[in-house]
Amino acid sequence: LLALCLSAPAMAQYEYGEGLDVPYVPSPNEVVETMLKLAEVKSSDVVIDLGCGDGRIVVMAAQKFGARGIGYDLNPERIKEANENAAQAKVQDKVKFIEKNLFEADIKEGSVITLYLLPGVNEKLKPRLLAELKPGTRVVSHSFEMGDDWKPTKTVEVNGRRVHLWVIPRRAAGN
C-alpha cells in the first residue's frame, strides 16, 4: 500500500492496452542493479523486461553483465527512448525493444524475466510465466509480489524498496 502511495504522483503517466493499466514509473538504477544481481544474471542469459519503459533494465543487463536482452512496452515513445539509451550505452547489438502488449510478448527465450508491474497485472501474468518459461528461469519483480499462492524464493530490500525473486519450478511428471 505504501508503494502505491509513493508512486501516486506518477500515476498520471499510464500505458494502456487491452485492460492493462500500468503507470510508467522507472526503477531507480540501484534497484535495477539489485534485481539483476539477485537473478544472478550472466553473459549467457536472455533478460526479458515486460513493461520496459526507457529500457534501463535491459541496457544495464547488457552493459554490466554481458547478457542479451529484450524489452517490451506499449508506448512508442518509451521504445524510442529505450533504443536511444541502448545506443548511448553502446549495447544496441545485444538488446532489442519491441512495441507490444506484455501479454502478447514472446517470453519463451528468456532465462530472466523482470517486472515492475502492479500486483493485479503480476497475478494475471503468473499463469503464463509458469506455463511458458523453462524450469530454472528467474523472475524478478520490483516491489510487487505474485499473489498469496506463489511466494518469492528470496526478497531483498534496497533503499526501502523490495525486490522479489522467484524461480520457475520443475514441472510434475507428465506436464
Residue locations for each model-derived region?
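Bacterial N-terminal signal peptides
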Residues: 1-9
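S-adenosyl-L-methionine
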Residues: 11-45, 76-109
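Conserved class I S-adenosyl-L-methionine
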Residues: 44-53
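Glycine-rich SAM-binding Motif I of class I
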Residues: 55-59
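Conserved SAM-binding motif I beta-strand of class I
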Residues: 68-73
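A short SAM/SAH-binding and catalytic strip from SAM-dependent methyltransferases
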Residues: 108-124
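C-terminal substrate-binding/active-site "lid" region of AdoMet-derived donor-dependent transferases
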Residues: 120-175
